[in-house]
Amino acid sequence: MGRGKIEIKRIENSTNRQVTFCKRRNGLLKKAYELSVLCDAEVALIVFSTRGRLYEYANNNIRSTIERYKKACSDSTNTSTVQEINAAYYQQESAKLRQQIQTIQNSNRNLMGDSLSSLSVKELKQVENRLEKAISRIRSKKHELLLVEIENAQKREIELDNENIYLRTKVAEVERYQQHHHQMVSGSEINAIEALASRNYFAHSIMTAGSGSGNGGSYSDPDKKILHLG
């Protein structure tokens, strides 16, 4: 967890106050040195402790820096407040941004073929070169995307071919299974018919033999009528 926010107020304990002063003073001197080195700024720092001890830092001669400060304060050209300086800076930056926006808008209109009447031959040539470069980049990107789409389509075609092969294999397996099952059923039916025919044949033979022995071994035709004489 982060450290809690320290309340900025006078430290009552003198020992703690002195320890904090030493730490903060060293940090302040370090920051002043870093500012002078990183930003090539002329920095002068003067600190008096509660006991009246002087601490100072200057990347240049501190007296010359103080004199420069006095001169800057007395110079009428440097009497502007910080707010006025900031306002002037932001006004300049705002004007620069507006100019950049206007330039970009004009350039876009030129690329669209508008507002060309005010351009010279050289400027028109520059617009033409920009368009050619833009078209070249667009075509290159389009070609790249088309290659990706073709590659994806080829991969999809291979996947579909593999799926078709798999489905045809499964269909062939089902057809072979059905054909084998049909052959087994047909063979069983033929065997059953042959067995039934065989049983009927033997039963008919036995009945025929029994009828022949009861009539003295003579063949009796049931369709013939017997004439009895009185």
UniProtKB/Swiss-Prot annotation:
Cellular component GO terms, alphabetical: nucleus
GO molecular function: DNA-binding transcription factor activity; protein dimerization activity; RNA polymerase II transcription regulatory region sequence-specific DNA binding
Keywords of this entry: Developmental protein, DNA-binding, Nucleus, Transcription, Transcription regulation
A Pfam match: SRF-TF
Region (Disordered), start-end ranges: 211-230
Chain ranges of the K-box domain: 87-177
InterPro entries associated with the record: MADS-box/MEF2_TF, MEF2-like_N, TF_Kbox, TF_MADSbox, TF_MADSbox_sf
Bias kind Basic and acidic residues: ranges: 221-230
Keyword Nucleus: yes
Domain MADS-box, residue spans: 3-57
Compartment annotation: Nucleus
GO biological process: positive regulation of transcription by RNA polymerase II
Predominant place of localization: nucleus
Subunit structure: Interacts with AGL15 and AGL16.
Identification of the protein by name: Agamous-like MADS-box protein AGL11
Organism, scientific name: Arabidopsis thaliana (Mouse-ear cress)
Gene (name only): AGL11
